[in-house]
Structure formats: structure tokens, C-alpha cells
């Protein structure tokens, strides 16, 4: 990796790209798309076409005559011939000339000549001979006549550190198939292999190309000729195996029709256990007895209408309710001439209200029945946990198991009392019988970790026993031979540290979203049944039995120690050891679960340990891990570092690369343990989804599991199509008091129970989502009861440990609020924006609209969200407004820029002036820096970027942290334009820094993190809250500055946890900058009260927008109330 590099080096990428003004990623309303950016067809080949002069391998291809049909070599040749042009420009010209080498060369030659002429005659009139030739496509920067993107580095003295661009792809660096010799690991040598028995087993064909029904499977047919008991048993197993299907889009209709009976059966079986309820009586009782707010909510009507309904109580029957007129007297008097129409409407309205109430109650009944069914499965887990000495009962809705293994070593318990308060409540009571205590101790097994011998692996069963086991697949038995018995938990597990938490967001990145591929399979209902039959027999032949010979469930024992497949240097924390045992318990019971440990406690560590444990006990893969883009490479590194014996394959790359990857991974099926991919690909186009769907994964892990907390989202539907025997959701967020989220999590755990109830659930959630009255945040009694029941029932399936419980492993965290003053310029701007807010609120409240059509439209289109955003920007920095560059200046600028070659021919002064009018002072300054020959005199020359109350406070903080304490610091901001300003501030202060935001290439993000760890001379890392606020590990810094806070405090907490997590050795200080007497104080107060968080679902952008709009409305009301009275007093 390199340090600072000159800006003209083509083989160095500036990170992130948005730090260059070529990409406008800001809150400015001006967001033009530069025509220089290649379309999808070129973008998909970008990594192959990109000119890399430092790569000697490319030189060999450019010295020979260009072969026909080789645009890659042609593009490299052009780049070498014209090194004074950027790669982007060469690509754009090559494309605009239809990939014709000769035409592109001629065009670039003319551009070079034009640039030379302009350089020597920069003061000449643009109308002279140096004017570009009249080829409209030749000026991609200005062929619209408007101002395009802001280009170039605005600060030649920038102290930002850049890193060399990655030369290889993620797959090349981490693929086990590509790098088979990179890691060697000694597997257990004491395997007892019976070659004669193995020779009798059928050959397993791995190649999977199309859907073949079980009764048509060629493997199955091959057994018919064998006429052996094993062949017959195998054929029966294939016929009943649901997880072994390989869907093809040509066969989906057939599969859907064949699955219909299974779906119906599942629903019928489930309904049989649900007690019949007289729905009409329940609805009538609700109408007569319910609270007004509940009545309004379930009938999907206004509070006023609900009061009218209540005024006619009691109703003798539902028929009497339908025949009641719910119009008030004023409405009747004002519409006496329309009585007939109103009577019909009234009747229709009564029926509509009744239908809504009926649908809602039916939905809540469905929820209640599902909760009851889930409870029975929860009891199975609870009963086995009691064998460990754990009592699950209690008010807490989540498990917080800590150090269960230590409960059995009385002499080791004394030192852990402080961190085992929850354990003390969970252990068996003092009145337990001696037999119960013996049973509790009997389920804990350990082994000698100092032994050099590998953990013994189970010997293969004789063919006769294998045949018998397969014949009884529907009721699996434990193989209990004295020589072959394997204690399920007697082997062990462990893993590293580093988790990748919730980020409430999958940031907007370049995760290879190929728009032309966004056509999805219409998979029908078969996926619901295929995916989720968690009680079905596992596809692999090593399935661990859940029933012993005497018909009783075997005890899943608590094991101590780490797996032998983990690196010898790794040791597990006690709570992590407990977490792996809990995962194993749920896995053996074939029930999915949620690991919700607090952010920074090493969920990644526990997952990799669990995979190592599964391989050690011969539970085969492949497994799948779905992660946010920012954490992809970190996951791959963690696998390499902590479990080198596991064979990991990343599924990530461009469109063409992924096509090659699919072929490679299909050809090497069975040669890898885990596939790691991103959410954008797992829920992407049909090819990616189909490939992953047909891998027949054993375990699927969803990192940042909050993305699955909305069962009605498109992403949830796509991800649930990925088949798996066991699903694990990782999240650092606690359960919210939100019924929709709880039911989504339940569907994730036990999806087959939801098939017949899906419509009833959707009716409730859709109704709740569109409620617009003041009671929209109210949970009806039925909903609150369901929430309480659901949270209690889900307790066995959700494990959450908080940092305060494992504080002995983490240094303390200190949070501070640093108040900042508005400077004079900020105060003037802020007061002006306040008046706009007040006027907007007053006019809407009084129903006054301007007579001028333009002003009226402006008022109606404005929203509280936009107005509050303006106040937030004023609290941050005055350069986020156009205050310095007045109309007179931008008129001169729009005229001067026409002398630039990019705008001389097609530039339109009026269009350019209009574009400039929407830009902020900082954006206009960047534009001037970008065109120094014509606009340099308009640049800001007085360090205006240093003039802000927050910048003053930041300077003092940085001096204390960097100069006085010699420590590192992370600075987070929600806005990329603020990060641009911070770049100039830090460069002015001469602090070296790195930057990461949503536009930073995924392939380069880990390089930045590595650079920050390795280079002690780089004290600052600036990050966007959304892109850098989750998943990554930055414990080398122990100071965090939140430059601007989010509406949701969870976002800021995640950002802070980049430093306060497992691996941190110093005390962590988190400082939030808040401008006094500004909107930021109000936001902070709302955040402290955690308002609106229950409805927050970060994956669902619509829900996020609703949250921000709601908070903005509240803030506008607060501002209006605080300022209207003083204003009236003055008058």
C-alpha cells in the first residue's frame, strides 16, 4: 500500500471516489448524471477494461496487432496512446464511437490538439479556431448544454491518504478453489474407513442442471436394478426429500402444481390444532365493548367516526350494526338534497367498517393461533435447556445465557459472580432434588484441550446399519453402537472475534446491481413449503437423530472447549462458548434462531466456531453466509484467520465474473464448506437467486438480520427462497414493541406455520401501515396482548447478551455531549430558515395559500422534512447554503465557464446559470477549483470552510485526542458533502486522514481499514454513518466523534460500536457535537426518548422515510410552538 500519491497517477485510486468532485453525492438539489459514465454494458466489463500501467502482464497484449473483436485490448491500447487523458474519458470516447478503434483514435487526437491550442491561447475568444469541431458527441461533458458533474481534486494540498487500487478480485484473493494450496490443515487421521463397505454405496452425482422429480431421478432409477434393501431405501428417501429439489425456471409451473397438495396439507394440519372460534360473536362483542382508539384502529377509520359508532351502542346483532347510519347531523343537514345517494353510501360504509373489523379480528386470531403453535416448539427447547440448569421463565423477553459451563465447576464459580447475575436467576433453585442436580451436571461434557490428539471423528457405520437407518429416515434413530457412538456435544467449538453488526442499512454501494438482470423468477408458493419445513428430514446422510430408541429425545449436552478445527491461538470467551452450545441445541432440534448479542460482542466469532463444530461432527455443508457489502471481506478474513480448515468461497463480482463463478462453484460442488455473499446479490437478479436457491445449503446465516424484520418486503421474500435446513439471523438490535417485526421474526424461525395465515397477517399490517390519524402509534389491546405473548414465546429462540453483562471482557465506554455555538453567519442563516418554517406552518394551519401560482405550488410541494433538513444544515455549516455566491457572481461565472472546451460548443449560459443557482457555496467553490483557468478568481480564499461553530469545537477535540493523548479517532457524518468539507478542514489543520463512504469500492474498503490499523501516523478516519457505521472493526481507535446525529439513536450507537467492541483494550470516548439553541437539541431530546423507534425497519426505505417525515412533523410543531408566542409578543 502506498501513502499519499500525486493526483495524476492513473494507477492510484482516490478513496472514496466521492471525495473527488466528479461525483456529487450531497443534499444539493442539483444532481446531474454525467454522460461520461459508461452504461451498464460497459460498466459490467469495467474491471477488465480498466487500464493499469503498473501491471506488466498487460503490456504483453498491447504490443501485437489488435485482433478483431477484442475491445479490451483496443481500449488498453488507446489508454497507452493517450496517457494525458483520464481512463473515463478514453472509455467514453471509445464507446461513443461504437467501439471503433480508428474513429476513437482520431477523436482523441482532435481533443488533444484542442487542449494544446486552448492552453496556449487561454485568453482568446471562444469563437476562434480553437473552438471544438462541430461533432456533438465529442463533448460528453456538456452535450446537454447544462453544467455537468464537478470534477477534479479541489485541494492540491490535501492531507488525505490514498491507497493503491486492488489488483485482484475478492474471489481471486479468498477462493479456496483458486488457492487450494494456500492453506493446509491436518484433518483427523484416526478415521476408520471400511473400503469394502464404501464400495457397496452408490455413486453420488454432484452435477445439477435441471429439476428432476424424486420419482424420475436417475440416481433413484439406478437403484431399481440393484434390487438391494439399500437401493430401495435410497429411492424412498429421494422421493420424500424436499430440500433436494433443483428448480429450473422451465419446470417451476410443474413444481408449483405438485406442491399445492403439500401446502394445503400443511395448512390443514395446522388448522386442526386451532380451536374453533365463533367469529361473529367475537366481532359483535368487540364492537360493543372495545375502547374508542381500538375501535378506530381495527375499523381503519377516524376517531370521529369511531365515536359515532360507539354512540349507537349496544348493537343487538351484526345486522343491526350494518343498518346503522354513521353520518352526523351536520352532514345530513348540509346534504339534504342527496339523501338517496347518502343512504346507499351509508349502507356501504357500514358494511365496509364491519368487513374491516372482521378482517382485523381474524388476523389477530391467526396470530394467536400461530403463537400457540410456536409455543409448543419452544417448550421442546426449554425442556432441554432445563437439563443445563437454565430456567427460561421470567419477565425478560430474551435469553441472556452467559457462563453455563461454569455452573458445574463449583470451585471456578466464585470469580464470575459479577457477570453472572442473569445466570444466578437461571440456575436451578436450592430446593432442587439431588437427582436433578446430578442430571444437570451429567449434560456437561468437556475434553482435555492440551491433548495433541485430534478430536475423534465417528467411524462410518456398516452398510447394513446404514441401510436400516435410511429405511427409517422419517423417524431417525441414533446409531448407538458402543464403538461408533458419537456424543453430539462432546466435541467442541470456538472462533475469533469480530462481528458485523446491524447497520441498519445496506448502504448505497456499487454492489454490482445489474439493472438489466432485475427480472426475478415467479416461484409461486412452492418455495414457502420447500424452504421452511423445519421438521422435515435433513438432506444429508449424517443427520443427527432427535429421537432415541426408546422414543425419548436424546439430551443435547453442553460441551466445553473449542473445536479442533479452529486455529490453536484462538480461545473463546465464556459467553461465546455458551452461545455455540445454544446454537447447537437449536440446530439439533431443527429450529432456526436469532443471535442478538449486543453490537461488538463477537457474533461472527460464534458463527465460525459453530461451522467448525458442525464439520468436526461430520455435519456436512455447504453453508451460506449473507452479509452487507462493507463486511464481506472482513468475514472472509475471519474465516481464513480463525478456521483455516474450512474451505470458503466468496460469491461476489461483476456480472461476467459471477457467471464464471457459478460455473466454477457448480463444477467444484462438495469441495467447499461455506459460500459468503452479499444481500444485493442474494436478493438480486434471477441468475444469482436461482444459483443460491439450488445449492441445498445446510445452514444459512443472515448477518445484520434487521434486514429480515419486515416480512412484506421484497428482500425478505427473495431471501426466504434460499433453501436451508437451519437459518440463523444475526442482529445487534433488541426486540421492539412492534407486532409486525415480531411476526416477521417468527416467520423466519418457523415459516411453514405461516403459509395458511399469510393473508390474514398482511391484512393487519397493511391496515396499520396506512393509518393516518393521531392514534397511528397506538397498539390496540388485541395487538398488545399478541405482542406480549409473542415476546414471551420467542424467548427460547432469541439469545441476547448485553455489554454490561460481559464488561469484564470490554473496557468501559464514556459518552459526552459537546455543545457548540452558532457563529454570526450561521445564526443569520438559521433565523432565516426558522421564519420559513413558521410561515409554512402558519399558512397550512390557517388554510392560507399564496395567490401567485408559483409561490402556491412551492408551498404545497414543500414538506416538513425539507424544512427541518434546512435547519439541520444551518446548524452544521454555512457553506451548505448559497450565501456567498449571489446571483450577480453566478451570472459572471456562467459566462466565464463557456470559455472551457467542455462547454464552448454546447454550453447554454441560461441552463448553466440555473444549475449554479441550486448549488451550495461549497459546491460552487469545488466547481471553481475544477476550472482554474476560467473560474479561479471566484474560489474561496479565506478558509471559509473553517468558519462554523462545530468546526471550532472539532479543532479543540482533535488537538486533545491527537496531540495531547496521541490516540486515534473516528469521525462520522450522515452527509457526504459534510465529509467533503471535513476533508478541507483536516487538510488545513494538516492532519493525515482516510475516508470511507457508500461510494468506496467494496474491493478497496478493507485496504483502507488495514491502512488505518498499520499506519500510526494516520490519526483520523472519516466515515459516513450509513456506509461505515456498521459491520467493520476499527478498535485501533478509541475515540469517536458523531459530527451530526441521526434521527434514530440506534444509528449513532452502531457507529460508536465500531470502536467499542471485542478486541478493544482502551477506554472508549464517544462525543456527539450538538449546536446549542438549534434543531439539533430537539433531535437529541427525541432520540433520548426513543420516539418513533418501534416503527423503524432500516431495510425498508419507505419505513425509513416515514420515520423521518414523522419526526420532522414533530420537530416543526415544536419549533412553531416555541417561536409563535414570542413573535406574537413582539407584535
Curated annotation (Swiss-Prot):
SMART domains: DEXDc, HELICc. Residues 16-36 have a biased composition (Polar residues). One of its GO terms (cellular component) is chromatin. A motif (DEGH box) lies at residues 703-706. The keyword Calcium does not apply. ATP binds at residues 597-604. Residues 417-432 have a biased composition (Low complexity). Its EC number is 3.6.4.12. One of its GO terms (biological process) is double-strand break repair involved in meiotic recombination. Disulfide bonds: none annotated. Residues 76-111 are annotated as: CUE-like region. DNA helicase that possesses intrinsic ATP-dependent nucleosome-remodeling activity and is both required for DNA repair and heterochromatin organization. Promotes DNA end resection of double-strand breaks (DSBs) following DNA damage: probably acts by weakening histone DNA interactions in nucleosomes flanking DSBs, facilitating single-stranded DNA (ssDNA) production by the EXO1 and SGS1 machinery. Promotes gene silencing at heterochromatin by regulating the chromatin structure within or around silent loci. Also required for heterochromatin organization at centromeres. Present with 6800 molecules/cell in log phase SD medium. This is ATP-dependent helicase FUN30. The lineage of its organism: Eukaryota, Fungi, Dikarya, Ascomycota, Saccharomycotina.
Amino acid at each position: 500500500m502506498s501513502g499519499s500519491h500525486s493526483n495524476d497517477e492513473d494507477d492510484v485510486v482516490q478513496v472514496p471516489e466521492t471525495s473527488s468532485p466528479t461525483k456529487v453525492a450531497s443534499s444539493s438539489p442539483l444532481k446531474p448524471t454525467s454522460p461520461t459514465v459508461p452504461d451498464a454494458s460497459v460498466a459490467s466489463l469495467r474491471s477488465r477494461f480498466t487500464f493499469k500501467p503498473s501491471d506488466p502482464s498487460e503490456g504483453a497484449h498491447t504490443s501485437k496487432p489488435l485482433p478483431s473483436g477484442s475491445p479490451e485490448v483496443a481500449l488498453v491500447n488507446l489508454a497507452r496512446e493517450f496517457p494525458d487523458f483520464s481512463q473515463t474519458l478514453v472509455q467514453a470516447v471509445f464507446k461513443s464511437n461504437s467501439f471503433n478503434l480508428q474513429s476513437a483514435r482520431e477523436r482523441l487526437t482532435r481533443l488533444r490538439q484542442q487542449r494544446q491550442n486552448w492552453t496556449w491561447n487561454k485568453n482568446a475568444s471562444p469563437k476562434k479556431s480553437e473552438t471544438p469541431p462541430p461533432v456533438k458527441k465529442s463533448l460528453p461533458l456538456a452535450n446537454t448544454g447544462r453544467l455537468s458533474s464537478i470534477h477534479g481534486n479541489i485541494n492540491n494540498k490535501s492531507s488525505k491518504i490514498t491507497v493503491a487500487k486492488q489488483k485482484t478480485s475478492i474471489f481471486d484473493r479468498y477462493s479456496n478453489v483458486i488457492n487450494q494450496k494456500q492453506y493446509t490443515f491436518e484433518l483427523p487421521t484416526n478415521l476408520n474407513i471400511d473400503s469394502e463397505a464404501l464400495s457397496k454405496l452408490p455413486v453420488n452425482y454432484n452435477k445439477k442442471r435441471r429439476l428432476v422429480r424424486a420419482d424420475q431421478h436417475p440416481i433413484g432409477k439406478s437403484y431399481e436394478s440393484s434390487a438391494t434393501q439399500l437401493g430401495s431405501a435410497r429411492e424412498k428417501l429421494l422421493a420424500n426429500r424436499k430440500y433436494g429439489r433443483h428448480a429450473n425456471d422451465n419446470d417451476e409451473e410443474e413444481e408449483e402444481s405438485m406442491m399445492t397438495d403439500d401446502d394445503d396439507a400443511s395448512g390443514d394440519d395446522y388448522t386442526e390444532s386451532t380451536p374453533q372460534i365463533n367469529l361473529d360473536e367475537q366481532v359483535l362483542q368487540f364492537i360493543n365493548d372495545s375502547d374508542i382508539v381500538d375501535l378506530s384502529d381495527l375499523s381503519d377509520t377516524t376517531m370521529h367516526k369511531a365515536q359515532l359508532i360507539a354512540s349507537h351502542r349496544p348493537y343487538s346483532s351484526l345486522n343491526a350494526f350494518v343498518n346503522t347510519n354513521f353520518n352526523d347531523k351536520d352532514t345530513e343537514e348540509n346534504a339534504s338534497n342527496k339523501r338517496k345517494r347518502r343512504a346507499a353510501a351509508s349502507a356501504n360504509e357500514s358494511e365496509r367498517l364491519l368487513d374491516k373489523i372482521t378482517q382485523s379480528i381474524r388476523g389477530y386470531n391467526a396470530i394467536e393461533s400461530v403463537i400457540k403453535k410456536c409455543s409448543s416448539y419452544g417448550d421442546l427447547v426449554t425442556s432441554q435447556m432445563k437439563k443445563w440448569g437454565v430456567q427460561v421463565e421470567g419477565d425478560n423477553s430474551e435469553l441472556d445465557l452467559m457462563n453455563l459451563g461454569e455452573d458445574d465447576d463449583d470451585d471456578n464459580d466464585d470469580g464470575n459472580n459479577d457477570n453472572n447475575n442473569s445466570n444466578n436467576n437461571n440456575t436451578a433453585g436450592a430446593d432442587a432434588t439431588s437427582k436433578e442436580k446430578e442430571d444437570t451436571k451429567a449434560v456437561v461434557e468437556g475434553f482435555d484441550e492440551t491433548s495433541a490428539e485430534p478430536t475423534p471423528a465417528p467411524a462410518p457405520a456398516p452398510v447394513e446399519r446404514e441401510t436400516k437407518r435410511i429405511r427409517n429416515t422419517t423417524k431417525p434413530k441414533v446409531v448407538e453402537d458402543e464403538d461408533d457412538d458419537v456424543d453430539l456435544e462432546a466435541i467442541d467449538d470456538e472462533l475469533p472475534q469480530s462481528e458485523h453488526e446491524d447497520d441498519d442499512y445496506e448502504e448505497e454501494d456499487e454492489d454490482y446491481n445489474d439493472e438489466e438482470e432485475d427480472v426475478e423468477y415467479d416461484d409461486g408458493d412452492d418455495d414457502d413449503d420447500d424452504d421452511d419445513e423445519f421438521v422435515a428430514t435433513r438432506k444429508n446422510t449424517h443427520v443427527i437423530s432427535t429421537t432415541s430408541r426408546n422414543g425419548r429425545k436424546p439430551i443435547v449436552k453442553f460441551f466445553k472447549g473449542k473445536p479442533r478445527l479452529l486455529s490453536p491461538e484462538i480461545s473463546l470467551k465464556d459467553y461465546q462458548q455458551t452461545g455455540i452450545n445454544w446454537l447447537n441445541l437449536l440446530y439439533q432440534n431443527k429450529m432456526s434462531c436469532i443471535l442478538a448479542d449486543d453490537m461488538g460482542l463477537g457474533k461472527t466469532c460464534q458463527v465460525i466456531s459453530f461451522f467448525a463444530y458442525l464439520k468436526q461432527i461430520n455435519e456436512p455443508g455447504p453453508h451460506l453466509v449473507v452479509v452487507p457489502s462493507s463486511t464481506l471481506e472482513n468475514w472472509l478474513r475471519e474465516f481464513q484467520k480463525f478456521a483455516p480448515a474450512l474451505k470458503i468461497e466468496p460469491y461476489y463480482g461483476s456480472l461476467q465474473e459471477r457467471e464464471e463463478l457459478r460455473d466454477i462453484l457448480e463444477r467444484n460442488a462438495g469441495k467447499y464448506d461455506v459460500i459468503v455473499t452479499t444481500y444485493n446479490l442474494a436478493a438480486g437478479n434471477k441468475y444469482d437467486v436461482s444459483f443460491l436457491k439450488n445449492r441445498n445449503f445446510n445452514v444459512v446465516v443472515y448477518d445484520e438480520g434487521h434486514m429480515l424484520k419486515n416480512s412484506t418486503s421484497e428482500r425478505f421474500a427473495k431471501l426466504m427462497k434460499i433453501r436451508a435446513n437451519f437459518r440463523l439471523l444475526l442482529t445487534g438490535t433488541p426486540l421492539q414493541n412492534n407486532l409486525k417485526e415480531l411476526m416477521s421474526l417468527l416467520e423466519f424461525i418457523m415459516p411453514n406455520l405461516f403459509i395458511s395465515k399469510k393473508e390474514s397477517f398482511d391484512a393487519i399490517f397493511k391496515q396499520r401501515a396506512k393509518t393516518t390519524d393521531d392514534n397511528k402509534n397506538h397498539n390496540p389491546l388485541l395487538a398488545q396482548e399478541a405482542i406480549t405473548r409473542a415476546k414471551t414465546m420467542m424467548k427460547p429462540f432469541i439469545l441476547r447478551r448485553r455489554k454490561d453483562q460481559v464488561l469484564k471482557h470490554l473496557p468501559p465506554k464514556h459518552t459526552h455531549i459537546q455543545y457548540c455555538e452558532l457563529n454570526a453567519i450561521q445564526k443569520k442563516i438559521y433565523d432565516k430558515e426558522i421564519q420559513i418554517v413558521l410561515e409554512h406552518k402558519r399558512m397550512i394551519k390557517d388554510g392560507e395559500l399564496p395567490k401567485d401560482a408559483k409561490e402556491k405550488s412551492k408551498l404545497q410541494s414543500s414538506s416538513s422534512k425539507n424544512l427541518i433538513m434546512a435547519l439541520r444544515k444551518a446548524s452544521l455549516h454555512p457553506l451548505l447554503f448559497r450565501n456567498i455566491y449571489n446571483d450577480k457572481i453566478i451570472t459572471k461565472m456562467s459566462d466565464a465557464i463557456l470559455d472551457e472546451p467542455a462547454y464552448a460548443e454546447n454550453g447554454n449560459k441560461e441552463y448553466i446559470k440555473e444549475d449554479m443557482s441550486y448549488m451550495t457555496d461549497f459546491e460552487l467553490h469545488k466547481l471553481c477549483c475544477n476550472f482554474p483557468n476560467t473560474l479561479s478568481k471566484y474560489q474561496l480564499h479565506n478558509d471559509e470552510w473553517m468558519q462554523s461553530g462545530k468546526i471550532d469545537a472539532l479543532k479543540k477535540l482533535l488537538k486533545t485526542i491527537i496531540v495531547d493523548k496521541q490516540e486515534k479517532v473516528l469521525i462520522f457524518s450522515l452527509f457526504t458533502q459534510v465529509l467533503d468539507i471535513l476533508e478541507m478542514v483536516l487538510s488545513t489543520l494538516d492532519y493525515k486522514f482516510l475516508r470511507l463512504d457508500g461510494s468506496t469500492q467494496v474491493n478497496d474498503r478493507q485496504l483502507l481499514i488495514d491502512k488505518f490499523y498499520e499506519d500510526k501516523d494516520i490519526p483520523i478516519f472519516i466515515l459516513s454513518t450509513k456506509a461505515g457505521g456498521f459491520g467493520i472493526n476499527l478498535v485501533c481507535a478509541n475515540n469517536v466523534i458523531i459530527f451530526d446525529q441521526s434521527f434514530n439513536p440506534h444509528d449513532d450507537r452502531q457507529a460508536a460500536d465500531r470502536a467499542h467492541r471485542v478486541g478493544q483494550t482502551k477506554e472508549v470516548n464517544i462525543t456527539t457535537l450538538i449546536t446549542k439553541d438549534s434543531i439539533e437539541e430537539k433531535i437529541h431530546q427525541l432520540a433520548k426518548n426513543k420516539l418513533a423507534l418501534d416503527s423503524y425497519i432500516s431495510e425498508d426505505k419507505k419505513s425509513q422515510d416515514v420515520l423521518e417525515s414523522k419526526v420532522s412533523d414533530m420537530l416543526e410543531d415544536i419549533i412553531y410552538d416555541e417561536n409563535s408566542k414570542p413573535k406574537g409578543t413582539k407584535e
